[in-house]
Design a protein with these regions (language model features):
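Conserved nucleotide-sensing/catalytic segment adjacent to the nucleotide-binding pocket
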Residues: 1-51
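Conserved NTP phosphate-binding and transfer environment spanning the P-loop NTPase/kinase superfamily
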Residues: 38-253
Length: 253
């Protein structure tokens, strides 16, 4: 687990078994304390005891029935559900995130800048359509559900680990209640979950928010077009992929 999400003194850190890339300091009592934030060292990691989670199992006798695209797009609510195999797969192909401290990047790179990393795999050495078709098949033929989970912030409000864990548990336990989101035909939204820390309800009547969301979706349209144009079309996706994200932009017009 990344330790930067759990500040020094956080009760969750009582369950750490080992840590690396973390620094330490001496407190007023002369005791050595672990510094979990990325202050001196970057990309702190730890092995955490399974006892950290009160709701845990050692084995799951069930097939994979859901895909979660984990993003850090500030225009997307903490969780939405995608309908349709093409949309589900292309949103993975246009996965928006921020540069992780685990990555080696050029000097001067803005770590807070949003960028698209198809399927969160910067190391792919084959055409992007291969992954697109595989994920599409899971949804289309295996009836796998697809969600986007935003683990960054939503329009300035931090989505905390308690929110993400609560969202996952609510869905896994079959307690999730999704409903149609605005004018989107293929996106549903859930407003409540276990451990919710703030009001994350998006206001599509807010012109500023709607424009930001439309811009984020347009970025995905541009990305899909770019796949077809760059590297002599090596990463071109089927036309249905472009149509699926263009439909989202049109719904915000």
């Amino acid at each position: 687990d990344k330790t930067a999400d759990y500040p020094t003194g956080c009760p969750d850190n009582e369950y750490l078994l080992s840590a690396q890339n973390c620094s330490c300091t001496m407190d007023s009592e002369g005791k050595i304390q672990l510094v979990t934030e990325d202050i001196r060292n970057g990309n702190g990691r730890a092995i955490k005891s399974k006892l950290w989670s009160p709701n845990r199992v050692d084995k799951i006798d069930a097939p994979v029935n859901a895909i979660f695209w984990i993003m850090k797009d500030p225009t997307i609510p903490p969780v939405v559900k995608l309908k349709g195999a093409a949309l589900a797969s292309v949103m993975g192909a246009t996965l928006a995130t921020k540069t992780s401290t685990a990555e080696r990047v050029a000097a001067g790179t803005d770590l807070n800048a949003l960028r698209i990393v198809p399927y969160a795999n910067p190391f792919r050495t084959y055409p992007l359509v291969n992954d697109y078709e595989k994920f599409k098949k899971l949804v289309e033929e295996k009836n796998v559900a697809c969600y986007i989970v935003n683990t960054g912030d939503f329009m300035g409000t931090k989505v905390k680990p308690a929110d993400t864990l609560g969202i996952l548990e609510t869905i896994v336990e079959g307690k999730a209640s999704f409903e149609k989101w605005g004018n989107f035909d293929d996106i549903e939204i859930m407003y409540d979950w276990e451990g919710k820390t703030a009001d994350f309800k998006p206001d599509l009547n807010n012109a500023e928010y709607k424009a930001a969301l439309k811009s984020a979706m347009q970025n995905r349209v541009d990305a899909v077009k770019g796949f077809a144009e760059k590297k002599e079309g090596y990463d071109k996706l089927p036309d249905e992929a472009l149509a699926a994200v263009q439909k989202l932009v049109d719904a915000l017009s």
